[in-house]
UniProtKB/Swiss-Prot annotation:
GO cellular component term of the entry, any: membrane
Highest taxon, organism lineage: Eukaryota
Main localisation: membrane
Family named by the database record: Belongs to the SMIM19 family.
Name this polypeptide is given: Small integral membrane protein 19
Keyword terms of this UniProt record: Membrane, Transmembrane, Transmembrane helix
Gene: SMIM19
Segments crossing the lipid bilayer: 20-42
Location of the protein in the cell: Membrane
Membrane topology: Single-pass membrane protein
A Pfam family annotated for this UniProt entry: UPF0697
């Protein structure tokens, strides 16, 4: 290519493929910028609608949250009751073993 990188053709005429590609690229960029700007303006005006779409899962999550804490409190209550029953069993068994030990020490 004696004339350069695609600027001059074989017959000496200007090769406009670079200019056409540039024009198409700038048109695409312009369309992308305009669409982005339009979406930004739409999002700014309809912020509540968009936020309502993304905020649907949290109400279902808040319903499960009290159940989670209820189950934790029930588990804690059950543990406390088990510990109380174990301590009561130990208290009932303790005087007998003390009486036995006292009897053994007296003998």
């Amino acid at each position: 290519m004696p004339g350069g990188y695609g600027v001059m053709g074989d017959d000496g005429a200007m090769d406009y493929s670079v200019h056409e590609a540039w024009n198409e690229a700038t048109n695409v960029y312009l369309v992308v910028i305009l669409v982005s700007f339009g979406l930004f303006m739409y999002a700014k005006r309809n912020k509540r609608k968009i936020m309502r779409i993304f905020s649907l899962p949290p109400p279902a999550e808040t319903l499960s949250e009290p159940n989670f804490y209820d189950t934790i409190s029930k588990i804690r209550l059950r543990q406390q009751l088990e510990m109380y029953s174990i301590s009561r069993k130990y208290d009932y068994q303790q005087p007998q073993s003390q009486a036995d030990s006292v009897q053994l020490s007296l003998e």
